[in-house]
Amino acid sequence: MESMEIKQELKRTWGPFFSRFGCFTQIQEITIPHILNKENVVVISPAATGKTEAVIAPIIENLLKGELKGLKVLYITPTRALVNDLFRRLEEPITSLNLTIGRKTGDHPVIEKKHLPNVLLTTPESFDSLLSREPMIFMNLFAVVLDEIHLLDNTPRGDQLRILLNRLRKILQKINSNLQYCALSATIDDLKIGDRYFDNSKVCFLKSPREIEYILIPAKNFIKEIFKIAQVRQIKKILAFFNARSFAESFSQKFRIPPFEDRVFVHHASLPRSKREEVEKFMNQSDRAILLATSTLELGIDIGDVDAIILYRPPYNISSLLQRIGRGNRRTDKLFAIGVYANNWEKILFETFFDCARIGELYEKRYQASLSVIPQQIYSYLYQRRRIGTTLKSIYQIFQSLYPEAIIKDVFKKLLSEGIIKEMRPGIYYLTDKIENKIAYGKIHSNIAEKSFGEYDVYEISSGVLIGRIFYLLEKFILGGKCWQKVQVLEKEKKVYARCIGEGPEFSKIFEGKGAGNYNYLLSTILKNRFFPTLLPEEIPFFYDGKNTHIFHLFGSLYGFIIAESLFEEGIDATDIEGKILMLQNFQMPDDRFPIPKLTSIKKVIANNIARFEDALGSGAFFYDLPNELQIEDHILNLDIPGFLEFIGCLKLREIDARDFTGTLRLISVEKKD
């Protein structure tokens, strides 16, 4: 369908949604005809390409041809901030068509049943609450839109949404409702993502046409360097991302120098809503400002055009990097970012992430349904059926296509034995008052759990100087090339005070600093190639010093810890060094196969570290409502242990001279002098 023909088809909605732009974007031209044809679509396109209008305008165009009574369009987006931002953007065009728009979030908890909006913006948690408390308001529904689906998918919240859609379909099946579904995403590795949420999805895919330009600078005096770059490039508006809100807050004062002074702001989830919205509004209207933010602004919140993106330290994965840099330079075909690295390892991570982002290789973890959602959805569904109760068969149906019945039954039996569920009549079950507080405060509708990714900041006990960061806290550990012994742990603050007890292995000194370690294990092959470009993808370098074996794996801290601890369970004195090197003490490899621990050993390590992994993996608010064996299984699935074991089973060890090994690593990790 040509652009002019699309415009003619949008008789009512062209003016309100597109006239101020004058033309359609490429993704809009691809998508709109399919939605007008009432197909289910997945729209994959970079930030700021007009995905929202590409979906909502043709849905409303079709909607205006029929009955407009009641709630017609359910628009689900990951956060309250996005709901508020979308409301600001969509209120005027929608109301100009004599339709109504509303929002349902924790900030806006009430909607009038007698005056339902035609379009409702909400979050998965508020959708859960509405479905449990007022299911009949959805009886006239016409379309469902899932916004920023990549931020939910492959998480407990994404699986919660899948089950909620099953429950919605279960309600509507009596009236043979034929809902239209649309999902939107800025970055996706898996083009079949839509199939998890609805049937017959048509993918409308636009690869990033925007060139990525970046500059990497060391953290020392980085603010001074950034201001130099800003002056040369005439940069006026900057968005800086930090991996922790404490960094964003602490650096805000240091940025308050000419020409920005009082135009430096901070934005993160802990700020009051009114303050966040005030900052967003100022950034949108200002022609010169700096905003220091956390991952909350990875989302499509409107803060106007930004000239440059600063990334202070590498983000957790490539998808996050793409989201962040996509917030800048919206009026040009080029993305410009400045990466600030604390050490050479972080510089290598930055280079690798940017290279992968340029070719669209995201290395996301393989999809696995989260088991911790099962108890949450049992509670929510039983609350929906609180007046008449429900059967176990009906509960199986809402989990259709996600979990085997045997697993659901195991969870159900645990909740029954603990008195959270009771059988009032033969085969008819109800919730008891054991979780009445969670019901009263709406907690049964949320899978969001506090998480810190399992990281601890490590401080030297006598000086209080920050040494670095580790993922898993052992009694003794290696960090920054030295051996440390734990002295004091402040669990709430995720701080560890430690005492140096000696030098670490010689080669570990090159890995000083706070490298990130929560990336997918598949990325290790790409990272290794930067150090040893002549090795085959399946080859892993190692050397034997006559006593110990040192294997350079780069799997990251999560998997490095699992391998070392599991081998230790099997009698091998194994140590992981910062997720990069596996040291086998007093051990020589018998052949060229990578040392693979048994699955039983891995399960034992996970069982002994349930809480640490739960914190690191963000396993969901109801994780501990699972039976113990399913807690272990949930971690196994979340970590994709079967895939990981298959991956390392294909690796071959390649012996390298110790001097070449350490020399190569030092050469790469030390900055070259001009």
Language-model segment annotations:
Residues L291-I309, R327-R330:
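SF2 helicase motor core recognition
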Residues E364-C483, Q488, T549-I551:
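C-terminal accessory/connector segments of nucleic-acid motor ATPases
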Residues P124, E225, E278, M283-S286, ...:
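Phosphate-interacting basic helix/loop segments used at nucleotide- and nucleic-acid interfaces
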Residues E538-E570:
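Short Lys/Arg-enriched alpha/beta "domain-start" segment
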Residues K334, S370, Y441-H445, F453, ...:
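Terminal, basic amphipathic appendages of nucleotide-handling enzymes
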Residues S3-K7, K11, G15-K281, R288, ...:
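Conserved P-loop/Walker A NTP-binding site and adjacent catalytic elements of P-loop NTPases
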